[in-house]
């Protein structure tokens, strides 16, 4: 921990504290400051001018990151009949209703669950297990659908879900430190464009209040929010 503390401080010295950088500069700086021995995730933290206590100011949605997430997503599809083959052909890792019992028994070796609407009655019984882990299928996220082929392809191809927390912040990954700068820039733009479009009509005043970017272990860099106003 002491060594990591020194590395963190050394990395922090490469940025100008209190300065807001253009996105391109900030991304380059985050890549430069990354010091962990593993391929760190590059994460965005956005503070929004909303009050999530009011239902009409909750910001949530999905976006397909053009350059992907850098993570191999394990996709589970709960479906029957022809939808089983459709999901398998689309590349799902696990398919079938038998996995519901496995989940009840403690199995959770997947990252995304997709379900056809007719299966949600059974899946709802697993809410206490799936909900806190962010694994519950949701129509708004496109994971409750009869078009399982599209849902699987999107999940495998870089689709992420975001939701504002109680403090008015959105946290989301945009790739890995090993990504090329232009890949991270493209993913960042896709995320920001989606969040800007998701501004609630009830939100008043400045919407995008602060944006910071960091690697998993590295210090944060503030991004200039002027382009998003």
UniProtKB/Swiss-Prot annotation:
In its keyword annotation, does this UniProt entry include S-adenosyl-L-methionine? no
Output the Gene Ontology cellular-component terms.
large ribosomal subunit
> Coiled-coil ranges per the record?
none
The record, for PROSITE patterns, names: RIBOSOMAL_L1
- One of this protein's Pfam families, by short name? Ribosomal_L1
Alphabetical GO biological process terms = regulation of translation; translation
The UniProt subunit note reads as follows: Part of the 50S ribosomal subunit.
Its biological function?
Answer: Binds directly to 23S rRNA. The L1 stalk is quite mobile in the ribosome, and is involved in E site tRNA release.
Report what the protein is called. Answer: Large ribosomal subunit protein uL1
Organism source for this protein?
Answer: Gemmatimonas aurantiaca (strain DSM 14586 / JCM 11422 / NBRC 100505 / T-27)
The organism that produces this protein has a lineage beginning with: Bacteria, Pseudomonadati, Gemmatimonadota, Gemmatimonadia, Gemmatimonadales
